[in-house]
């Protein structure tokens, strides 16, 4: 009997690879994965086991069903607090009545006044019953001093005194933050718990938790990534056995297309992401909704810059990667070189002892396509992809556009639940009712289950690609949530929240907003990029680590800025500059770019920013010009320049440059500034003055003295 791989044996006896792996584990036979080779002896043992009855292998599964069952979160409202003010109000009413009677009594006026005052002085309100300290108090966001006192059963004045001892001056209606609430509660030995209340605009508030028994196997969502012209769309075309490329402008995919195929009764959904550099964000979005990434690399071209970008996106999304080595039918093809190059990025073939599946194929001739589809189904089986089809649909927008005839059109990928025609829906910051649905073949459908891509119409506006969508029970709620989300987005745009920058990095770290610092490193040569990356990854301050999301060689491009914007990263340029498009995009997206020529300066700047010790930035501002019209040499003083202020003004504490024939001769400071015989602080345009320069005497007639000051740039 010949040797067989795990998945081949599983296929031969008509069971899943996972059952075989479990059986081998129970037999104390170590195998890495479904691609491992089985010896003849092992195959015989498996034959014997499954002939006796393999039910024992799978019998453990049902017992685990309830283990991971999500427990519903019973968020009961806090019990109504006893109305403590009622007694007090009643007493006030009694006192008011008493005072009225007192005013009406005119006999013995002064005596009665004195008696009543004495009575009121000693007449005390009934004491409030003391409330026992609770074991735990819950709050959301913040509490006022009065509300916290109510929760603890204490007088507000008592809490105000405690706050004063802690250096906090607070009134009864002042809001207290989380730390102060916890500190005061700990003084009384009471635990605190912050309850996160979801806003009306958050779709998570309207979601229902799925039960384990409701989950069913769903088709995998596969993203095809790779460099330009490496054959991504041709590969997808070959898999679908239809012509997609011919309809694309210039043979390059212009929009994300979502397609579905069926193989042996099992469906697979494909996302075709554009490979052109300008569509970096579209490729990043494709990786966020995917279950498996197919990395297409041309066997005759090898690893290219966008191949590396695709690897980084797939790793960031934490999805398994299958490498499709395309164009193996070409004479110049060298699959081994591709495998060797990809090992540098952590993709080691199984044939070399790694865990990455490599499939050699030709998208043009169709060679290796069946094996690739089989590998996709195999990986999805191991991943155990599940969703609940019997609930309101939820998913992601793949693409959206405004069509002249149909209005707002959005391509949606249903990730869980079933989408129906007529469903009220909120998509990102838009809302509407699903008027019509069309599948990837252009046919009208009425329903779409998990992992199904459909094109819908009926929204009030065009959503953004990458937005989440959720179906609601009624149109009124959907409209309310959609309008609230649109209003919130408008407010956020007005506030113009800035991206992460080194200037405000320390504040964000202190507030807990930043746990990892994402960096994109671009250098002039690969060696510099590697050295800088290695040095940066060693930095760790207060538990905050540096994370390099992309490295590259060459100028900083628009693609780098878009990636930085999407991942909230800072761009580090080493001996390189940003091109024109990159500069304008960085300004529009508020992306921080730092340019350096010395490695240790980069390290120092990042560390200083993380520690909150970043030096302030200054910019030079020219404030005036003085034309030297005459010079005087005085012993013990040096050369005095008699000048005329031609522009702006000059001050005694300004810096200056001595310019002769357009060339800067000297840069220094003003020593003495006089007008006639008087020392002055400033001389304005149109006036004459006398100037001496610190430690410099070579001043000639016709020289220009340029005065400037260094102004600190306001941190953004």
Curated annotation (Swiss-Prot):
Residues 93-109 have a biased composition (Low complexity). Residues 217-386 form the tr-type G domain. It comes from the Bacteria. Residues 362-364 are annotated as: G5. It holds the Pfam family GTP_EFTU. Keywords: Cytoplasm, GTP-binding, Initiation factor, Nucleotide-binding, Protein biosynthesis. GTP binds at residues 226-233, 272-276, 326-329. Residues 53-135 are annotated as: Disordered. Residues 326-329 are annotated as: G4. Residues 251-255 are annotated as: G2. Residues 57-83 have a biased composition (Polar residues). Residues 272-275 are annotated as: G3. Residues 226-233 are annotated as: G1. One of its GO terms (cellular component) is cytosol. It is found in: Cytoplasm. SUPFAM superfamilies: Initiation factor IF2/eIF5b, domain 3 (SSF52156), P-loop containing nucleoside triphosphate hydrolases (SSF52540), Translation proteins (SSF50447). One of its GO terms (molecular function) is GTPase activity. One of the essential components for the initiation of protein synthesis. Protects formylmethionyl-tRNA from spontaneous hydrolysis and promotes its binding to the 30S ribosomal subunits. Also involved in the hydrolysis of GTP during the formation of the 70S ribosomal complex. Belongs to the TRAFAC class translation factor GTPase superfamily. Classic translation factor GTPase family. IF-2 subfamily. HAMAP family: IF_2_B (MF_00100_B). This is Translation initiation factor IF-2. The lineage of its organism: Bacteria, Bacillati, Bacillota, Bacilli, Bacillales. The gene is infB.
């Amino acid at each position: 009997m010949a040797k067989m791989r795990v998945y081949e044996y599983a296929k031969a006896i008509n069971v899943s690879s996972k059952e075989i792996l479990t059986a081998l584990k129970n037999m104390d036979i170590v195998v890495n994965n479904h691609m491992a080779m089985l010896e003849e002896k092992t195959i015989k043992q498996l034959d014997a086991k499954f002939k006796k009855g393999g039910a024992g292998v799978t019998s453990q599964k049902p017992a685990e069903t309830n283990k991971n069952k999500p427990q519903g979160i019973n968020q009961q409202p806090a019990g109504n607090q006893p109305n403590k003010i009622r007694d007090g109000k009643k007493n006030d009413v009694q006192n008011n009545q008493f005072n009225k009677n007192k005013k009406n009594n005119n006999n013995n006026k002064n005596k009665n006044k004195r008696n009543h005052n004495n009575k009121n002085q000693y007449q005390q309100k009934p004491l409030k019953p003391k409330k026992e300290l609770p074991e735990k108090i819950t709050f959301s966001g913040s509490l006022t001093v009065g509300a916290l006192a109510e929760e603890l059963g204490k007088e507000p004045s008592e809490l105000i005194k405690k706050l004063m001892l802690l250096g906090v001056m607070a009134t009864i209606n002042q809001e207290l933050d989380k730390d102060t609430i916890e500190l005061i509660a700990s003084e009384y030995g009471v635990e605190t718990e912050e309850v996160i209340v979801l806003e009306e605009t958050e779709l998570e508030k309207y979601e229902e938790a799925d039960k384990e028994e409701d989950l069913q196997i769903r088709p995998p969502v596969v993203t095809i990534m790779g460099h330009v012209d490496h054959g991504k769309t041709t590969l997808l075309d070959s898999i679908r056995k239809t012509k997609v490329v011919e309809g694309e402008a210039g043979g390059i995919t212009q929009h994300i297309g979502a397609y579905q195929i069926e193989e042996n009764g099992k469906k697979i959904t494909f996302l075709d992401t554009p490979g052109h550099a300008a569509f970096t964000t579209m490729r990043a979005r494709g990786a966020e909704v995917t279950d498996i990434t197919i990395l297409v690399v041309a066997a005759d071209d090898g690893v290219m810059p966008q191949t590396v970008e695709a690897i980084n996106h797939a790793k960031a999304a934490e999805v398994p990667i299958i490498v499709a080595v395309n164009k193996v039918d070409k004479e110049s093809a060298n699959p081994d070189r591709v495998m060797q190059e990809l090992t540098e990025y952590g993709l080691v073939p199984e044939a070399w002892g790694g865990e990455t599946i490599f499939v050699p194929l030709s998208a043009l001739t169709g060679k290796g396509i069946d094996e690739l589809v089989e590998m996709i189904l195999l990986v999805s089986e191991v991943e155990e992809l599940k969703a609940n089809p019997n609930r309101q649909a939820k998913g992601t927008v793949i693409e959206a556009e405004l069509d002249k005839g149909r209005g707002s059109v959005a391509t949606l990928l249903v990730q869980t639940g079933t989408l129906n025609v007529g469903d009220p829906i909120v998509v990102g910051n838009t809302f509407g009712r699903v008027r019509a649905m069309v599948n990837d073949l252009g046919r009208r459908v009425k329903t779409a289950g998990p992992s199904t891509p459909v094109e819908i119409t009926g929204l009030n506006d065009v959503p953004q690609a990458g937005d989440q969508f959720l179906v609601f029970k009624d149109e009124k709620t959907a409209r309310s949530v959609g309008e609230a989300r649109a209003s919130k987005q408008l407010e956020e745009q007005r506030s113009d929240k800035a991206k992460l920058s080194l200037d405000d990095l320390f504040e964000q770290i202190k507030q807990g907003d930043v746990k990892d610092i994402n960096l994109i490193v671009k250098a002039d040569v690969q060696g510099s990029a590697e050295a800088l990356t290695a040095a940066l990854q060693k930095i760790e301050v207060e538990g905050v680590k540096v994370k390099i999301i992309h490295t590259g060689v060459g100028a900083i491009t628009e693609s780098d800025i878009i990636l930085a914007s999407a991942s909230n990263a800072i761009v580090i340029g080493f001996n390189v500059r940003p091109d024109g498009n990159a500069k304008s995009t960085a300004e529009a997206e508020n992306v921080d770019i730092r340019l350096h020529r010395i490695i240790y300066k980069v390290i120092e700047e990042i560390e200083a920013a993380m520690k909150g010790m970043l030096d302030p930035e200054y910019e030079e501002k020219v404030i005036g010009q003085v034309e030297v019209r005459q010079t005087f040499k005085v012993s013990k003083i040096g050369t005095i320049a008699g000048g005329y202020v031609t522009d702006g003004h000059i001050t005694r504490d300004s810096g200056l440059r001595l310019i002769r024939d357009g060339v800067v001769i000297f840069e220094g400071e003003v020593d003495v500034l006089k007008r006639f015989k008087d020392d002055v602080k400033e001389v304005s345009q149109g006036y004459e003055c006398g100037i001496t320069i610190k430690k410099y005497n070579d001043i000639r007639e016709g020289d220009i003295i340029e005065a400037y000051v260094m102004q600190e740039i306001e941190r953004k």
